[in-house]
């Protein structure tokens, strides 16, 4: 999750250097002092930068290990998992600020609960370009972002949408929605966020409503595109069925649904069992596979034929367009996860 500070225009000195030139009685002495101070700052920053880079590399390496997802994480209590993530990333956030690498308008890394995103802003832009390419999103589109998190896609919306377009994001994690409401505002007053009080064993254990009973707070045929980034990878079959039905309801005719999954096919199963990928689902439950019986919502993969049946049931195109990802060890792919794009018939 590397972020760089905006480069300083040529010829403009840092404030500290400018003050030395303006107030020093002897310009040569002032320049010497300024050089010494710059050298001290660089000397102090270098080990800090190395430490932060090492911490980031370690985190990304862990997220690429199948045993980390399928063995270690399920063994830890949910509260401890979330505390450890914050404890690990909070010093990285502090170091970013000291190094001048934190970008205003982006959430602290310790508050990002949506997986192994290296560059949050760049990830949002790439996601937008992907849905423009595969789902036909344009600046006038009405977009529904199911499971918007801390705004990975939403941060790209203010510069993308025109006055005719609109964005609605909802999520079940209160902290994510609160951050989005405070920090993401569009010029046309057409970007909105909603907290869904929906239960999930991993992401919202205090939620009062079951996802299988949840009705999206939107009118019929309100959206051109619905986007779900790594949402169904944490939802059980009965809940996926409900959400797909609700998405079909709120999509306009010929609207597109773009969702990411881990899809079990003969190819992905062979690669996964050979240890080629960074995800491993060891429990086969027929329609779906899971990391852990203890906390199924940590990671769920779906059988391709099962997904196609749900899509067909709710009036979405079958077969949908599937862009297989790299999670199981494929050398190439549109994304790490599999991306499925379907049209409302």
Q: What annotation goes with each model-predicted range?
A:
Residues 140-149:
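Conserved class I S-adenosyl-L-methionine
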Residues 224:
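Conserved acidic residues
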Residues 41-134, 150-157, 166-215, 256-345:
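Class I (Rossmann-like) S-adenosyl-L-methionine-dependent methyltransferase catalytic domain
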Residues 230-231:
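Short catalytic micro-motifs in class I SAM-dependent methyltransferases
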Residues 241-253:
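A short glycine-rich, Lys/Arg-flanked "PGG" loop and its adjoining helix->strand segment in the class I
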Residues 227:
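A conserved beta-strand element that flanks and buttresses the S-adenosyl-L-methionine
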Residues 162, 235-236, 251-252:
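Helix-to-beta-strand junctions that scaffold the AdoMet/dcAdoMet cofactor pocket
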């Amino acid at each position: 999750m590397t972020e760089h500070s905006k480069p300083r225009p040529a010829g403009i000195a840092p404030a500290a250097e400018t003050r030395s030139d303006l107030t020093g009685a002897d310009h040569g002495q002032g320049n010497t002092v300024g050089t010494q101070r710059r050298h001290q700052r660089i000397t102090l920053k270098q080990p800090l930068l190395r430490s932060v880079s090492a911490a980031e590399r370690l985190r990304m390496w862990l997220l690429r290990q199948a045993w980390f997802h399928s063995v270690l994480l399920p063994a830890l209590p949910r509260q401890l998992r979330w505390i450890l993530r914050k404890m690990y990333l909070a010093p990285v956030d502090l170091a970013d600020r000291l190094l001048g690498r934190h970008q205003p308008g982006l959430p602290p890394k310790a508050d990002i609960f949506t997986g192994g995103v290296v560059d949050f802003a760049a990830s949002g832009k790439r996601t937008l370009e992907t849905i423009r390419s595969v789902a036909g999103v344009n600046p006038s589109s009405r977009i529904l972002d199911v499971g918007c998190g801390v705004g990975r896609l939403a941060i790209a919306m203010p510069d993308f949408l025109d006055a005719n377009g609109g964005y609605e994001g909802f999520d079940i994690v209160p902290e994510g929605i609160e951050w989005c409401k405070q920090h993401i505002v569009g010029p046309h007053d057409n970007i909105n966020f909603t907290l869904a009080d929906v239960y999930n064993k991993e992401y919202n254990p205090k939620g009062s409503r079951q996802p299988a009973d949840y009705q999206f707070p939107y009118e019929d045929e309100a959206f051109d595109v619905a986007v779900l980034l790594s949402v169904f990878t944490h939802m059980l079959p009965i809940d996926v069925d409900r959400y797909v039905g609700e998405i079909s309801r709120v999509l306009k005719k010929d609207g597109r649904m773009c969702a990411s999954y881990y899809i079990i096919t003969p190819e992905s199963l062979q690669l996964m069992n050979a240890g080629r990928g960074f995800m491993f689902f060891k429990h086969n439950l027929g329609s779906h596979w899971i990391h852990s019986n203890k906390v199924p919502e940590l990671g769920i993969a779906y059988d391709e034929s099962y997904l196609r049946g749900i899509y067909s049931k709710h009036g979405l195109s079958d077969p949908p367009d599937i862009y297989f990802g790299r999670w199981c060890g494929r050398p190439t792919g549109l994304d790490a996860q599999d991306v499925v794009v379907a049209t409302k018939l």
